[in-house]
Regions:
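The right-handed parallel beta-helix/beta-solenoid scaffold, focusing on the short coil/turn
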Residues: 47-49, 57-59, 67, 77-79, ...
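OB-fold/S1-family RNA-binding modules
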Residues: 8-15
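Short, small-residue-biased leader/transition segments that mark boundaries at the very start
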Residues: 1-3
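Thiamine diphosphate
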Residues: 133-148, 152, 157-162, 175-189, ...
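N-terminal, Lys/Arg-enriched amphipathic/low-complexity engagement segments
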Residues: 20-69, 77
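Long terminal segments
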Residues: 191-265
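Feature marks extracellular polysaccharide-active and adherence modules
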Residues: 52, 72-74, 81-82, 91, ...
Length: 265
């Protein structure tokens, strides 16, 4: 057997073809050290993998490409860091630094996510059903057709989009009705990209002077419609109803909003 599927923490196959090779391999994380678990994932020849009993192991799917991975449990920090083309689905919550420097692919989280989600993200899509912690989308950046997207179904903590340089951050606030779905100091140091907040409430008073806010028009809603529909399809929501609501957009107010901070020649 090329992958030792029947021993050392690998469960029996759920389904198989004529020669006995299963369509989806299952790996039990349990109390395995993260290095051992990640080695099994990285060397597995199968295109589809299910991870069972995941409990805090770090760096899962780090730099991985070309696979579909389903995670049962709670992965540790830096899930999908440097991800390069995988489809990863977490049936639970995730912790900090999820999607750190993610390059491409899709990460879906059926729960909440911790701090610094999408740190330095430069491509791909992260879909979070629930809330996200502090500093989500910090240092996000885009280049030509590489445009990162972070969609949050609930609300975001403070310092959302800190130093954002590109891409889209979309916070839907589906569980928030009496306040904007964002914490203190959103868009601090923002100099590129866009933040969309679905809300009828006033914006926080501490948006930086270098950042402008306005109500999204139809053209701007059309920009994010594909991402909202992708989110709605994953989590069973009504995309048309979401897009019909009011969105506020945060954008930097010039190509160099921090000119006054530097000495000019």
């Amino acid at each position: 057997d090329v992958y030792k599927r029947q021993i050392d923490g690998v469960l029996p196959p759920r389904s198989g073809d004529a020669d006995g090779r299963e369509q989806t391999v299952r790996i039990v994380a349990g109390d395995k050290h993260f290095r051992e678990l990640n080695e099994e994932i990285n060397t597995c020849p199968d295109a589809e993998i299910e991870l069972d009993n995941v409990c805090g192991q770090r760096y899962i799917c780090s730099g991985l490409s070309g696979k579909k991975v389903t995670i049962h449990g709670i992965p540790g920090n830096a899930l999908c860091c440097y991800l390069d083309g995988c489809d990863v689905e977490v049936l639970g919550n995730a912790q900090d630094a999820t999607g750190d420097t993610m390059n491409s692919g899709t990460l879906t989280i059926h729960g909440h996510c911790g701090d610094a989600t999408g740190y330095a993200m430069r491509g791909g899509t992260i879909l979070i059903e629930g809330n996200v912690g502090y500093r989500a989308g910090i240092h996000m950046k885009a280049y030509q057709t590489h445009i990162p997207v972070l969609v949050v179904g609930g609300e975001a903590g403070s310092f959302l989009g800190e130093y954002q340089a590109g891409g889209y951050i979309i916070v839907l606030g589906l569980n928030t009705h009496d306040h904007a779905p964002v914490g203190r100091f959103p868009a601090a140091g923002m100099h590129g990209g866009k933040i969309f907040l679905r809300t009828d409430c006033d914006m926080p008073f501490d948006i930086p002077a270098q950042v402008l806010s306005h109500e999204a028009d139809d053209a701007e809603k059309a920009e994010i419609a594909p991402f909202v529909r992708q989110f709605a399809e994953k989590f069973g929501k009504d995309a048309d109803a979401i897009l019909a609501d009011r969105f506020v957009v945060l954008v930097p107010d010039s190509a160099n909003p921090y000119r006054s901070m530097y000495v000019t020649n």
